UniProtKB/Swiss-Prot annotation:
Protein EC: 1.1.1.-
Role according to the record: Short-chain dehydrogenase/reductase, part of the gene cluster that mediates the biosynthesis of melleolides, a range of antifungal and phytotoxic polyketide derivatives composed of an orsellinic acid (OA) moiety esterified to various sesquiterpene alcohols. The first step in melleolides biosynthesis is performed by the delta(6)-protoilludene synthase PRO1 which catalyzes the cyclization of farnesyl diphosphate to protoilludene.
Note: Armillaria species are both devastating forest pathogens and some of the largest and oldest terrestrial organisms on Earth. They forage for hosts and achieve immense colony sizes via rhizomorphs, root-like multicellular structures of clonal dispersal. One genetic Armillaria gallica individual localized in Michigan's Upper Peninsula stands out as exceptionally large, covering hundreds of tree root systems over approximately 75 hectares of the forest floor. Based on observed growth rates of the fungus, the minimum age of this large individual can be estimated as 2500 years.
Family statement: Belongs to the short-chain dehydrogenases/reductases (SDR) family.
Source species: Armillaria gallica (Bulbous honey fungus)
Protein name as annotated: Short-chain dehydrogenase/reductase ARMGADRAFT_1018421
Gene3D superfamilies, A to Z: NAD(P)-binding Rossmann-like Domain
GO terms of molecular function: oxidoreductase activity, acting on the CH-OH group of donors, NAD or NADP as acceptor; quinone binding
Length: 261
């Protein structure tokens, strides 16, 4: 795993860093020795302020930047701001994403466009402009995307979400091939259910008593439990490290053994 001595002076940018998996990734990378730029929407400013304070508390530099990852101009400006504030970009974690639980027939074209705009288009734009910055710097880098178990095995009620996450696997493989000659690796992580605010939202929609859904999901995992955000952050920490220098084009499951390749 990455260590402070190895990662000292390197810069990471994490999108969707206000809460859940993104926040856990940002804090883990800071503990690994990275200076960390945080991205989210302005509505999540309080969460970003809190995360930045936690990063600075472990002696790392940081900043936060508002941007909608589905908008190309905002992504370009975000990456330029990271370089201006922290001196470069070594690791890009494209974590921002949204979900939707709806039957296939009830999912509208507008629903589909909204989900894929953030999840798939947003990942494409972050891969593209982070990759360009890393090529300009000339010292390689790490790009890491957020796939899902639903990006490997479709699930009922998640048609738009599944489409976006299957697409991320394809983008990851193509980017790995094109960016590889520049010393840039591109991988993704694929969590199953994770105890996050998004998970809590689905529990509310389903209407099960608190804890019942988790018990049922735990039964589907070979290791008997679903993930915490920190479980995902550990995998990202490794993919961001120099020890992962020969891994690229891969989408790594982090689900306790729910989906197998």
């Amino acid at each position: 795993m990455a260590s402070t001595s190895v990662s000292q002076g390197r810069v990471a940018l994490v999108t969707g860093a206000g809460q859940g998996i993104g926040r856990a990734i940002a804090l883990r990378l800071a503990s690994d020795g990275f200076d960390v730029a945080l991205n989210d929407l302005q509505a999540n400013e309080a969460n970003l302020v809190s995360a930045l304070a936690a990063i600075e508390a472990v002696g790392r530099k940081g900043c936060y930047i508002f941007a909608d990852v589905s908008q190309e101009t905002e992504v370009e400006q975000m990456i330029s701001k990271v370089v201006e504030e922290l001196g470069g970009l070594d690791v890009m974690v494209c974590n921002a994403g949204i979900s939707l639980m709806k039957s296939f027939f009830d999912t509208t074209a507008e629903d589909f466009d909204r989900i894929t705009s953030v999840n798939l288009r947003g990942t494409f734009l972050c891969y593209k402009h982070a990759g360009k910055q890393m090529v300009t710097q000339g010292k390689g880098g790490r790009i890491i995307g957020a796939c899902s178990g639903t990006g490997k095995k479709g699930q009922p009620l998640f048609s738009a979400y599944a489409a976006s996450k299957f697409g991320i696997r394809g983008l990851t493989q193509v980017a790995a091939l094109e960016f590889g000659p520049h010393g840039i690796s591109v991988n993704a992580f694929a969590p199953g259910p994770v105890k996050t605010p998004m998970y809590d939202h689905f529990e509310t929609i389903i209407g099960t008593p608190k804890g019942v859904l988790e018990q049922e999901l735990n039964k589907t995992a070979a290791l008997g439990r679903i993930a915490l955000p920190e479980d995902v952050a550990v995998v990202v920490s490794f993919l961001a490290s120099k020890e992962a220098s020969l891994i690229t084009g891969q989408t790594i499951n982090v689900d306790g053994g729910i989906v197998f390749d």
